[in-house]
Regions:
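N-terminal localization/anchoring segments of enzymes in phospholipid and broader phosphate metabolism
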Residues: 1-202
Length: 202
């Protein structure tokens, strides 16, 4: 074989890579309606809003903060806020496990949506991969919006992004917050799962 003529195996590899890369295109961006928080005036009309207004009137110039340092108390408070919400629930979490606590809280969100509460859930795709089916089912509900934070271009080919865009590997969404009726919130260091709420077996 003369020099300068590519070996047939090399040509085959180049052709195969070209075909594979041609298939690596992103799906079209879906048109979604704009989602906004409820106005402060509307939030004040909810039971949570009334309760907060009463406390603010009783303690002018101050804000209310309560430390939730017990795991079980934190889960009870999260559940109570979800059940008390009448208009909106906004949640952002880095990790959401598919265990008892995680499943119970997802069920509470679905129940809230059935009451007519608009639920918006943002989770990090790295910490929720085992929940794909559950999150897809929730997102199909007319009152629930589920969004995944994922800095990679291709969700099912992360290894390719790890190799070609390693700087994105550590871009994660570490928020941990639940906001009810745009008025009361629980935030801190706890993700959603049995190990965070003291309900692990053993």
């Amino acid at each position: 074989m003369s020099e300068g003529v590519p070996h047939p195996t090399r040509l085959l590899v180049v052709a195969l890579v070209a075909v594979l890369l041609a298939g690596c295109v992103l799906p079209p961006v879906q048109d979604r309606p704009t989602s906004t928080a409820i106005a402060t005036e509307q939030a004040r009309l909810t039971p949570i809003g009334h309760a907060v207004e009463q406390q603010l009137d009783a303690h002018p110039g101050k804000v209310g903060i309560h430390l939730l340092d017990e795991p079980a108390t934190t889960f009870a408070a999260l559940t109570h806020l979800v059940r008390s919400a009448q208009r909106t629930l906004d949640l952002q979490y880095y990790i959401w496990y598919r265990d008892r606590s995680g499943t119970l809280l997802l069920r509470e969100l679905l129940d809230a949506a059935e009451r007519g509460v608009r639920v918006r859930l943002l989770v990090d795709d790295q910490g929720t991969r085992q929940l794909d089916a559950e999150l897809a089912a929730l997102d199909a509900h007319p009152h629930i919006e589920v969004r995944l934070f994922n800095p990679f271009l291709a969700r099912n080919a992360r290894w390719l992004d790890f190799i070609t865009r390693f700087e994105r590997a550590n871009r994660r969404m570490h928020n941990k917050v639940l906001i009810a009726d745009n008025t009361a919130l629980i935030s801190g260091g706890r993700n959603v799962g049995d190990s965070y709420f003291g309900t692990t077996e053993g």
